[in-house]
Amino acid sequence: MNNKFLIASALCMNLGATVNAQNPIIQTQLTADPAPMVDGDTLYVYTGHDEDGADFFWMNEWRVYSTTDMVNWTDYGSPLDLSSFSWADDRAWAAQTIKRNGKYYWYICAHSKLSGGIAIGVAVSDSPTGPFKDALGKPLFDNGQWDNIDPTVWIDDDGQAYLYWGNPHLYYAKLNDGMISLKGGVDPKEAIDDKRQVGRIHMTVDGFGAPDVENRDSTVKYKDNYTEGPWFMKRGKNYYMLYAAGG
């Protein structure tokens, strides 16, 4: 993309609350990858769920919690799991929900039975707490690679929605207005496919703490280099990205 991003690294995201709140805010489930969404006067937090006793990132479902005061939380259980996607069979990892035109779109990543890689899918609902259903009946993006993780979506002021994801590379795509298909038209210098549906944002030390992975010096210890979990926002004329960093 041609925009100049101001980058902020986030080693972790703490959705704790006021001095009266009890931390961790979720104590009855092993949750990961909190993704906040504000709708009206309510904050919703969408999470993954680590299985008890697992020795890897064994995760089969996503969960939803909400609060109106940052102290008291409501647990809505799991309105979305791997069985919601006929093409998925493992690794219900980091995901995000966003509202548009009265509907709620939950962008997820999971292991694909179709390709053997990690694929990105999208579920839709009329309510922020579900029920959600697979919007496509197939992955939104699936190229057989493992690095299609941590999808997030951001909508610019002009209404164009963007999908971001990736580890250790940072990928993006434009979404159509319906939010469930790729629009194409990414910068040809960044496109990774002939249809120009998906682009890769190239990294620099100034922008991301390190150059692209293939250009890194194994003898250099880079600081705060991009790893995964890209979250975009805009304030004034500047675009910001927060991400999970490794050093």
Predicted stretch roles:
Residues 1-22:
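Bacterial Sec-dependent N-terminal signal peptides
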